[in-house]
Amino acid sequence: MAKFEAHLKCSFCGKSQEQVRKLIAGPGVYICDECIDLCNEILDEELIDNQTKTREANNPSNKNHTAITSTSKPAPTLATIPKPIDIKDFLDKQVVGQEVAKKILSVAVYNHYKRLAWQGDGNQETDLTATRLHKSNILLIGPTGSGKTLLAQTLAELLDVPFAVADATTLTEAGYVGEDVENILLRLLQKADMDIELAQRGIIYIDEIDKIARKSENPSITRDVSGEGVQQALLKMLEGTVANVPPQGGRKHPYHDCIQIDTSQILFICGGAFVGLEDIVQKRLGKNSIGFMPTDSRGQNHLNRDLDNNQMINNLEPDDLIRYGLIPEFIGRMPVTAVLEPLNSEALEAILKEPRDAVIKQFRTLMSMDNVKLEFDEGAVTAIAQEAFRRKTGARALRGIVEELMVDLMYKLPSEKNVSDFTVTKKMVDEMIIGGKVLKLPSNEKIDHPESA
């Protein structure tokens, strides 16, 4: 037996067991430690080659970095940044009301991009004694449908910068099922056509930020992976850091290269309804409970409660947000707070008619493609606005109501050749609201349009 063992050798290189450190036996074969090391080197080389090919195929930011940066839009200069008054004038064309919020946003956005222009001139790099300008992110507080997302979107349109919207309710702390916070940056990068420099000057709007408030005022012994954990994960990104973003989204992988994005120049705007925040404010102020007021069939008296609640929110202090569930560090990184007012029926009427992309203007354009002139009389506009106000979902309700109203009309009109114009009246809107009836073409097809009620 000893004689047999003396002749054992590696089945691959032929070296005997005396010539190597280790000889591992298998079913009828042997392999030495030197051959194992050689196999590992071959596998590592193939793995690196495959990673390089995959990265070049799937990561355009690395493959075309030189081409992308050479065609990137120039950084803003003080001469090209619109002034706060001009910014507000542009917002007025798209957003009805919210005068105070628009003024706050105009100043905050102007200062942010003025800071970028100042840094782009090299002031902060050449003069070590120069004052450092820090970023001021924005927190928007307002009921649903009051225009929070539209304000942020309109600002990005004016400034011609990439704009991405993220939903805070989908985010979770790293290591748990859900989206990592870095995926927010990937959306912005995709909006910028993978242009890193352009993305770093963009705007990110994080909606439903109130939904990541921690569940209780006191820290819990259990993990709050979609509440306080997400707030902690967002801190560095909001303040300004170099984040590693997986180019394909999802979780980070140790074998995948990440794109590095500097968030110090990205403007973050967070928005939420913060339902119940007014109760926290009124408790601090020692006010009597507002309570729900009696309403008529149209829900008109709800407006008084909304206005009182809005007055409460205007007395907001950071401590109220902490009691609501935001951590102090998170609030400190959102120094600019703008409160949006609830929309009354008059504001909803204006939203129906006045903005560039008003709902009525959109439907007129759609009908004009079928050579039909569509009109809404004043009574119809008022009735639609009052119904939207009753539904308590803000401006979002307007389009849904008009869609319900027009569905049958828009189904038949494209096939009608002898209808040149159509007027929507208050009677038609009331019939739809009360009886669920939709607009129909006149029974006499020779009539161009129905008489106003």
From Swiss-Prot:
SUPFAM superfamilies: Glucocorticoid receptor-like (DNA-binding domain), P-loop containing nucleoside triphosphate hydrolases
Domain ClpX-type ZB: 1-51
Entries under Pfam families matching the protein: AAA_2, ClpB_D2-small, zf-C4_ClpX
Binding site for Zn(2+): C10, C13, C32, C35
Gene3D superfamilies with a match to the protein in the record: 1.10.8.60, ClpX chaperone, C4-type zinc finger domain, P-loop containing nucleotide triphosphate hydrolases
Keywords, in A-Z order: ATP-binding, Chaperone, Metal-binding, Nucleotide-binding, Zinc
Top-level taxon of the source organism: Bacteria
CDD domains the record matches: RecA-like_ClpX
Record PROSITE patterns: CLPX_ZB
GO molecular function, one term: ATP hydrolysis activity
Stretches the record annotates as Disordered: 53-77
GO cellular component: HslUV protease complex
InterPro entries, per database record: AAA+_ATPase, ATP-dep_Clp_protease_ClpX, ATPase_AAA_core, Clp_ATPase_C, Clp_protease_ATP-bd_su_ClpX, ClpX_bact, P-loop_NTPase, Znf_CppX_C4
Protein's GO biological process: cell division; proteolysis involved in protein catabolic process
List of residues binding ATP: P143, T144, G145, S146, G147, K148, T149, L150
Biased composition (Polar residues): 57-74
Family note: Belongs to the ClpX chaperone family.
Function: ATP-dependent specificity component of the Clp protease. It directs the protease to specific substrates. Can perform chaperone functions in the absence of ClpP.
Assembly description: Component of the ClpX-ClpP complex. Forms a hexameric ring that, in the presence of ATP, binds to fourteen ClpP subunits assembled into a disk-like structure with a central cavity, resembling the structure of eukaryotic proteasomes.
Protein name as annotated: ATP-dependent Clp protease ATP-binding subunit ClpX
Source lineage: Bacteria, Bacillati, Cyanobacteriota, Cyanophyceae, Synechococcales
